[in-house]
UniProtKB/Swiss-Prot annotation:
Binding annotation for ATP: R266, S267, E268, E353, I354, S355, S356
Disulfide bonds: none
Binding site for L-serine: T235, S236, E237, E289, S388
Enzyme class: ligase
Name of the protein this chain belongs to: Serine--tRNA ligase
Entry's EC annotation: 6.1.1.11
PANTHER family the UniProt entry points to: SERINE--TRNA LIGASE, SERYL-TRNA SYNTHETASE
GO biological process: selenocysteine biosynthetic process; seryl-tRNA aminoacylation
CDD domains associated with the record: SerRS_core
InterPro entries: aa-tRNA-synt_IIb, aa-tRNA-synth_II, aa-tRNA-synth_II/BPL/LPL, Ser-tRNA-ligase_type_1, Ser-tRNA-synth_1_N, SerRS_1_N_sf, SerRS_core, tRNA-bd_arm
Length: 430
């Protein structure tokens, strides 16, 4: 959430920066709500002061034995108006809060300006795409003989679900374990196991709600139809980041670095017709997430570090990739700056997103009221960052396609052999 003081003092500048994201700020609506708030607060204070003065006057009159009925009647009238103001003010404040909750984060200075993914800027590449001396197959055709079963997934749950069995299920698990070990043992993250179902206020904290409800899977508890809203997580960023919600942390507790492997559930609203073949876009997929809670002065450096942590996985797997900076029009709602990592997929002859790392600055912290105490004893908002380290399913796709052999077998990347019990090649079922 944006700082309301920023809008109050620099409304036109905020509007200009939001316009870079393709968002039109309704300055008139904000100004009208602000005027109403100020009028109600001013009138409430005036009425309270007048009531207090009249109450003293009543005491003086009664002390003298004089008639105070007229003044008491006036106090009664003031009380009615004061009650009306006190009831109206929270309504206006809630409208202001809802207005702010619908605004995305402001892009950092230096983020490339653009309307969509065509405005993204490549930063660097690593590795050289392999040259094949045979016709390349995609992961769907390769996986069919290795236990990747989209038909069973569709029979069980509908489109965009996958069923895995045997050696490919083992490879999927090996990838997740390898990623977790790298992030915890080499990069200093604390491994976590978090709930996959969360309450509404948790999603408000990280910015998925209220704006993106249609992207979520909603949960209805049997026998509790009147219960509160709950949702399946779309990323473990949600529970990990919210561990500091409504807390005041000691400065020396920062940075906090958390990681978790979890399934992620996304309705993919608005994605009809996109990536309908294979595992690229699924309703359920696994991901190893990285989250950092840091001092505001450290968040830009933490973002660069986090990107390096995601890159390390791809480098260990020897998968070619590139790093791009997302433009203003392609960033996520809560992000001030985002890097995407895109892995090379031979069958598509292009790079596809496999990780997204974002600095959200104080945007999520303000929504969560996550703060730390400075050396001067002042409470300030922390900065939050999140990144994929990595998306497990898309990494599986990249391994299958980049390590395929002419006979349909898959060479296991060296880094994964210990996680596969020494198995070095996946061979198609005869």
């Amino acid at each position: 959430m944006l700082d309301i003081q920023l809008l109050r003092g620099q409304l036109s500048q905020v509007a200009e920066r939001l316009a870079l994201r393709g968002v039109t700020l309704d300055s008139g609506a904000f100004t009208a709500l602000e005027d109403e708030r100020k009028q109600l607060q001013t009138r409430t204070q005036e009425l309270q002061a007048k009531r207090n003065a009249l109450s003293k006057q009543i005491g003086i009159l009664k002390g003298k034995g004089e008639d105070a009925s007229a003044v008491m009647a006036e106090v009664g009238q003031l009380g009615d108006e004061l009650k009306a103001c006190e009831q109206a003010l929270p309504v206006v404040l809630e409208k202001l809060n809802a207005f702010l909750a619908g605004l995305p984060n402001l892009p950092q200075e230096g983020v490339p300006v653009g309307e969509d993914e065509t405005g993204n800027v490549e930063v660097r590449r690593w590795g050289t795409p392999r040259s094949f001396d045979f016709e390349v197959k995609d992961h769907v055709d390769l996986g069919a003989a290795l236990g990747l079963d989209f038909d069973t997934g569709a029979k069980l749950s509908g489109s965009r679900f996958t069923f895995m069995r045997g050696q490919i299920a083992r490879l999927h698990r090996a990838l997740a374990q390898f990623m977790l070990d790298t992030q915890t043992l080499e990069h200093g993250y604390t491994e976590c196991y978090a709930p996959y179902i969360v309450n509404r206020e948790v999603l408000v904290g990280t910015g998925q709600l209220p704006k993106f409800k249609e992207d979520m899977f909603w949960v209805l508890r049997g026998g509790d139809e009147e219960g509160g809203e709950q949702y399946l997580i779309s990323t473990s960023e949600i529970p990990l980041t919210n561990t500091v919600r409504e807390q005041i942390l000691a400065a020396d507790a920062l940075p906090i670095k958390l990681t978790a492997h979890s399934p992620c559930f996304r309705s993919e609203a608005g994605s009809a017709g996109r990536d309908t073949r294979g595992m690229i876009r699924q309703h359920q997929f696994d991901k190893v997430e990285m989250v950092q809670i840091v001092h505001p002065d450290a968040s830009n450096a933490a973002l660069e570090e986090m990107v390096g942590h995601a890159e390390a996985i791809l480098q260990k797997l020897e998968l070619p990739y590139r790093v791009i900076t997302l433009c203003t029009g392609d960033m996520g709602f809560s992000a001030a700056k985002t890097y995407d990592l895109e892995v090379w997929l031979p069958a598509q002859n292009t790079y596809r997103e496999i990780s997204s790392c974002s600095n959200c600055e104080a945007f999520q912290a303000r929504r969560m009221q996550a703060r730390f105490k400075t050396a001067q004893g002042k409470n300030e908002l922390v900065h939050t960052l999140n990144g994929s380290g990595l998306a497990v399913g898309r990494t599986l796709v990249a391994v299958l396609e980049n390590y395929q052999q002419a006979d349909g077998s898959i060479v296991v990347p060296k880094a994964l052999v210990p996680y596969m019990g020494g198995l070095e090649v996946l061979r198609p079922a005869s």
